[in-house]
């Protein structure tokens, strides 16, 4: 059991090194899939011998481990074949070599340059579908030779050229029969309408569904192919994707056009301004009510008022502060003369209830605990926390979970994820800064808190 845990920890360390390095070469991607295969083999062996947990990781069923191990073997073979081709020297990322990307249409091909297009059925802006097309597609022919072609879009769907044949991996006619009524549709790439809505003239049922002759597009009047790369270079001024929102896939549920969204946004902003103005009036009324209540109650509660008039909470606080200052002057020698500037932030322990008095407590609490705020992607921060706990030992007192800011009026996350690291002393924080090695794309800033 201990031997299995040690092997599993070594595999996890190697995987973390790959994720943090961010290398974009095919050798690293092959190593990544080989490690994933070894991980599933270890799980399979553990489950077969009755071990239900390796370290903190539950062991999946035998069928799950077997299926994932076979997927990893298949990916290793594909990548090793691609490595021997001229395209093996191109940069390859974890996303481009993931199982999900390889299995997405067109299946068993590598792709680069994803781009979203929209198809409107029945000329109805509410009946809109979104599809993912690719700028470049890498496929194997019958001789197991890799070829790189450009992805294209026409009225019938998204395709690429395999020799003299069009290989369609998305056909709009299929979804037109499901979601449309008239058999008409428009194709929109970015902000451009490529084709006017005409009756579909897709290949006949007797022809192949995956590939149609290259002159099949001549059967419709607006039939003209459009390269995915040319579209992306021609119209790049599109609204940036919203963070933490659901991204469009191929296909998603129906969406609305941008013009309707702009109208709704303008209406919502006008309503929001009205709501803000109403909210300001309500807050003003609450302040007036709270002031009247404080004025009516303060003669009974105020202790130090010389004239007996209304005393607010802020006035009572100022009076208590003046009393504490007068007491501290009378016993200044016992308080130790205050906290030196270099001592502020030197303690992280919360001051307990002691007979030293309020001034002693305030002086002790002036030493605030130091922290470091990290900003970056959630997965990178979690990986860094996992490694830092083993690498830096007791230098860090506490690690927070990942969190994000949200807006005052919405629940949408703002910016990147955050993580806090708390330390016992400033010296330990400085030592940690000298030793720490952050993943790419993660930055940091210093701070301190009143209490942890």
From Swiss-Prot:
Range of residues in the leader sequence: none
Basic residues compositional bias, start-end: 256-270, 320-330
GO biological process entries: DNA replication; DNA-templated transcription; regulation of DNA replication; viral DNA genome replication
Composition-biased stretches (Low complexity): 227-239, 309-319
Pfam families: PPV_E2_C, PPV_E2_N
Annotated spans, Transactivation domain: 1-201
Keywords: Activator, DNA replication, DNA-binding, Early protein, Host nucleus, Phosphoprotein, Repressor, Transcription, Transcription regulation
CC annotations in GO: host cell nucleus
InterPro entries to which the protein is assigned, alphabetical: E2/EBNA1_C_sf (IPR035975), Nucleotide-bd_a/b_plait_sf (IPR012677), Papillomavirus_E2_C (IPR000427), PPV_E2_N (IPR001866), Reg_prot_E2 (IPR033668), Regulatory_protein_E2_N (IPR036050), Regulatory_protein_E2_N_1 (IPR042503), Regulatory_protein_E2_N_2 (IPR042504)
Post-translational modification, as annotated: Phosphorylated.
A Gene Ontology molecular function term of the record: DNA-binding transcription factor activity
Residue span of region DNA-binding domain: 368-452
Main location: host cell
Residues covered by region (Disordered): 198-356
Subcellular location: Host nucleus
Record-stated family: Belongs to the papillomaviridae E2 protein family.
Complexes and interactors: Binds DNA as homodimer. Interacts with protein E1; this interaction greatly increases E1 DNA-binding activity. Interacts with protein L1; this interaction enhances E2-dependent replication and transcription activation. Interacts with protein L2; this interaction inhibits E2 transcriptional activity but not DNA replication function E2. Interacts with protein E7; this interaction inhibits E7 oncogenic activity. Interacts with host TAF1; this interaction modulates E2-dependent transcriptional regulation. Interacts with host BRD4; this interaction mediates E2 transcriptional activation function.
HAMAP family (alphabetical): PPV_E2
Protein purpose: Plays a role in the initiation of viral DNA replication. A dimer of E2 interacts with a dimer of E1 in order to improve specificity of E1 DNA binding activity. Once the complex recognizes and binds DNA at specific sites, the E2 dimer is removed from DNA. E2 also regulates viral transcription through binding to the E2RE response element (5'-ACCNNNNNNGGT-3') present in multiple copies in the regulatory regions of the viral genome. Activates or represses transcription depending on E2RE's position with regards to proximal promoter elements including the TATA-box.
Name this protein carries in UniProt: Regulatory protein E2
Lineage: Viruses, Monodnaviria, Shotokuvirae, Cossaviricota, Papovaviricetes
């Amino acid at each position: 059991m201990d031997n299995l845990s040690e092997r599993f920890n070594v595999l996890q360390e190697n995987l973390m090194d790959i994720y943090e390095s961010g290398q974009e070469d095919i050798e690293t991607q092959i190593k990544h899939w080989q490690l994933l295969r070894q991980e599933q083999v270890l799980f399979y062996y553990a489950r077969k011998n009755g071990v239900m947990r390796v370290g903190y990781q539950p062991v999946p069923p035998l069928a799950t481990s077997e299926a994932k191990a076979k997927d990893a073997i298949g990916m290793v073979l594909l990548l090793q074949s691609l490595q021997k081709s001229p395209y093996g020297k191109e940069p390859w990322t974890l996303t481009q070599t993931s199982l999900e990307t390889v299995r997405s249409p067109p299946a068993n091909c590598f792709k680069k340059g994803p781009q979203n297009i929209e198809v409107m059925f029945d000329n109805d802006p509410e009946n809109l579908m979104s599809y993912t097309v690719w700028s470049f597609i890498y496929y194997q022919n019958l001789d197991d030779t890799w070829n790189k072609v450009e992805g294209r879009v026409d009225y019938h769907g998204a395709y690429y050229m395999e020799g003299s044949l069009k290989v369609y991996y998305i056909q709009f006619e299929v979804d037109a029969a499901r979601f449309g009524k008239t058999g008409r549709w428009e194709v929109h790439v970015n902000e451009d309408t490529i084709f006017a809505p005409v009756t579909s003239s897709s290949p006949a049922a007797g022809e192949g569904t995956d590939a149609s002759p290259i002159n099949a597009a001549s059967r419709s009047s607006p039939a003209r192919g459009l390269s995915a790369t040319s579209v992306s270079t021609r119209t790049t001024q599109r609204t940036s994707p919203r963070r933490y929102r659901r991204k469009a896939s191929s296909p998603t549920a129906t969406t609305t056009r941008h013009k309707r969204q702009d109208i709704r946004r303008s209406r919502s902003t006008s309503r929001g301004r009205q709501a803000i103005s109403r909210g300001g009036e309500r807050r003003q009324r609450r302040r007036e009510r709270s002031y009247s209540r404080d004025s009516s109650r303060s003669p009974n509660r105020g202790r130090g008022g010389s004239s007996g008039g209304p005393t607010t909470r802020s006035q009572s606080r100022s009076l208590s502060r003046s009393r504490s200052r007068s007491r501290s002057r009378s016993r200044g020698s016992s308080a130790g003369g205050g906290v030196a500037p270099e001592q502020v932030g030197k303690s992280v322990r919360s001051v307990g209830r002691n007979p030293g008095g309020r001034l002693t407590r305030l002086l002790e609490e002036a030493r605030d605990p130091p922290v470091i705020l990290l900003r970056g992607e959630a997965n990178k921060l979690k990986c860094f926390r996992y490694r830092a706990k083993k690498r830096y030992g007791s230098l860090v007192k506490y690690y927070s979970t990942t969190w994000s800011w949200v807006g005052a009026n919405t629940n949408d996350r703002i910016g990147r994820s955050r993580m806090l690291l708390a330390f016992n002393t400033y010296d330990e924080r400085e030592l940690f800064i000298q030793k720490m090695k952050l993943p790419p794309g993660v930055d940091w800033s210093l701070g301190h808190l009143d209490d942890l």
